[in-house]
């Protein structure tokens, strides 16, 4: 949406000189080789930001000075797109100056701007009401320097008195100079957290103000490493905020949530639903699960984070009558349902993505981006998320919300550690291979895949939201790629759902056209594929590691393959356990069930979510060993187109079972080379 014809001032856009506290000296690039700082045709000369907390309203001022060093930089530098929320903020443009050959012109005129409401999270059903003041700088050429300066005045009403700011001092491209500044009153006590060796501020007092200044010149750029956890900050950065306790942060929101929950008596229809659940079962755990599903089935996710809506839940009656809401609304509704059952429940704030590091954050309302419910039952905590699709499982098997730490909105609140779930086999595959004596015929593969816990939730959602035949096609296509063979379906995919245990089993049966490949005129070879390591563990580059390695949820995975041969086969069985850092463990075994049937089992245990950077070498060694020993390959002899027994009636070992030599050597080389 655009309203370019409306007067700029009436749209929350103003034009004025920069604040007196924010000097704007002329840019001097003499002696600078800007191309040495250039990336994609742009050199960043100055990135400066300031937060002034001393006035009646908070003022955040930004200055960005960039040079166009190549044609590719023209488009990005020509765009100027400051964002603000017109409901409680004002945008003040201080200047949009183009400097060419030492001569400056100001393009920051009211008629140059269009006000656009760009809902960046529209596809996620989130509306925040922020506005972009958009302009394209005209007549921009290579060699020009663009100097943009603006302020945003005001703050979210719900967060007044709760300042916090995270800023970056080391960018992904070289920057000539970065300056960040906080101006506060001496009585405004601050807490600071510095990341990756960020410098301490220079602190000075002037005219009754305390000024904290960080200044960094040059320095190497920083590129985040792949497979680092979301909470990892490997670049120089600083978090600063008012000295507050977690209890004070909870108190900011507690009355809002309690007011929404106790919005008069519960709606009649909602109360009737809760009474019906209580009439069906007297077991508290069973009531909890039914209450959670009631919320998950009733509420459609839709977030209107406009104004205070980003922090304040709607009233219970409104939530129930509209049947939609965001995480705050879902938590209010679920807390009400559980309390009507006579249970102890409260809303709790969490951080999706960075929750594991939350206990190291400076206490601040901006430390959180999600809301769930904490249930206290029989002396333990349960963490429930009303925004998830309807979940299966009794309370013991239900997938709980796991975000590291949570802040319950109760009096005298403190952060509470969310205990990790018990180690569970979340994926178990059983394959039964039957090889015909006629080498030209297809082998038969019967496969069952059992998913548990959160993996079962994902599988169940796939089954419920698409045609089963289409889902079967997806699974078959993937298996054809893994086996490098065409498959013919023997029977349709079947689904077995154990709702209380929260497990889903998919059963498939195929004829495998090329189960074995010729390696000579009288031999065929079978090679299994890796469905354990690569789908479950990240493959990291070689060389030193700076950031932790994210392994994902704690879990176990297992594949069991049974082979039925038409002839007598023998090779030595084995059973080996491979251990890695952080408790990683893989077990690989082969055992004979009888003279013509063998079983190959591979299991992987991941008991930790993160490895430290100094464990990278041991982790690579673990991966290589599992690659080299985790698969199975064997050769079968052919005579006149038929599989035959081993020489000497099967007493002579002729079968070759090994480490999929060709495949794993390639994998090991790729791992060592960082590919």
Predicted regions and their residues:
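A sensor for short, sequence-defined functional sites
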Residues: 5-668
């Amino acid at each position: 949406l655009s309203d370019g014809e409306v007067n700029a001032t009436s749209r929350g856009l103003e034009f004025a000189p920069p604040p007196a506290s924010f000097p704007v000296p002329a840019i001097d690039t003499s002696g600078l080789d800007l191309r040495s700082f250039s990336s994609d045709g742009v050199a960043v000369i100055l990135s400066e930001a300031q937060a002034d907390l001393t006035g009646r309203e908070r003022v955040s001022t930004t200055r960005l000075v960039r040079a166009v060093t190549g044609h590719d930089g023209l488009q990005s530098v020509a765009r100027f797109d400051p964002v603000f929320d017109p409901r409680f903020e004002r945008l003040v443009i201080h200047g949009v100056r183009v400097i060419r050959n030492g001569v400056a012109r100001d393009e920051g005129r009211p008629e140059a701007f269009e006000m656009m409401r760009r809902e960046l999270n529209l596809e996620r059903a989130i509306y925040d009401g922020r506005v972009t003041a958009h302009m394209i700088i005209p007549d921009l050429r290579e060699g020009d320097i663009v100097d943009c300066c603006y302020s945003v005045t005001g703050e979210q009403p719900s967060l007044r008195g709760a300042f916090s700011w995270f800023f970056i001092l080391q960018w992904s491209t070289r920057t000539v100079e970065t300056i960040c500044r906080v101006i506060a009153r001496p009585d405004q006590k601050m807490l600071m957290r510095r990341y990756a060796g960020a410098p301490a501020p220079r602190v000075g007092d002037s005219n009754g103000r305390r000024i904290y200044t960080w200044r960094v010149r040059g320095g190497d750029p920083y590129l985040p490493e792949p497979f680092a956890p979301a909470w990892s900050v490997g670049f120089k950065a600083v978090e600063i905020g008012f000295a507050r306790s977690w209890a004070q942060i909870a108190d900011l929101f507690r009355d809002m949530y309690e007011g929404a929950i106790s919005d008069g008596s519960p709606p009649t229809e909602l109360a009737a639903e809760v009474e019906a659940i209580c009439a069906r079962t007297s077991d508290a755990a069973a009531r909890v699960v039914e209450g959670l599903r009631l919320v998950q089935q009733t509420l459609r996710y839709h977030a209107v984070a406009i104004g205070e809506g980003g922090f304040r839940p709607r009233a219970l009656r409104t939530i129930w009558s509209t049947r939609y809401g965001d995480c705050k609304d879902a938590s209010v509704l679920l807390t009400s349902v559980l309390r009507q059952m006579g249970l102890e429940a409260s809303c709790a704030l969490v951080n999706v993505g960075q929750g594991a590091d939350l206990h190291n954050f400076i206490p601040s309302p901006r430390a959180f981006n999600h809301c769930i419910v904490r249930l206290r039952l029989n002396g333990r905590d349960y963490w429930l998320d009303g925004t998830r699709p309807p979940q299966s499982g009794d309370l013991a098997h239900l997938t709980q919300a796991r975000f590291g730490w949570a802040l319950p909105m109760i009096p005298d609140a403190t952060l509470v550690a969310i205990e990790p779930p018990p180690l569970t086999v979340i994926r178990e595959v059983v394959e039964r291979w039957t090889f015909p004596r006629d080498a030209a015929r297809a082998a038969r593969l019967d496969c069952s895949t059992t998913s548990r816990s959160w993996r079962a939730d994902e599988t169940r959602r796939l089954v419920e939201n698409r045609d089963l035949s289409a889902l079967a096609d997806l699974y078959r296509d993937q298996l054809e790629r893994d086996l490098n063979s065409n498959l013919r379906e023997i029977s349709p995919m079947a689904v077995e759902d154990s709702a209380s245990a929260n497990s889903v089993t998919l059963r498939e049966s195929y004829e495998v056209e090329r189960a074995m490949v010729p390696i000579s005129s009288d031999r065929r070879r079978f090679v299994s594929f890796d469905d354990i390591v690569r789908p479950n563990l990240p493959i990291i580059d070689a060389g030193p590691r700076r950031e932790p390695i994210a392994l994902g949820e704690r879990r176990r995975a297992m594949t069991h393959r049974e082979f039925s041969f038409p002839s007598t086969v023998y090779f030595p069985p084995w059973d080996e356990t491979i251990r890695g850092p952080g408790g990683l463990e893989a077990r690989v075994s082969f055992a004979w069930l009888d003279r013509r049937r063998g079983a190959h089992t591979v299991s992987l245990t991941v008991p930790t979510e993160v490895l430290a950077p100094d464990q990278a070498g041991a982790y690579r060694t673990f991966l290589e060993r599992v690659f080299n020993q985790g698969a199975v390959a064997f050769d079968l002899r052919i005579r006149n187109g038929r599989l035959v027994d081993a020489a000497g009636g099967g007493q002579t070992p002729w079968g070759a079972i090994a480490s999929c030599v060709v495949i794993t050597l390639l994998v090991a080389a790729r791992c060592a080379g960082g590919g």
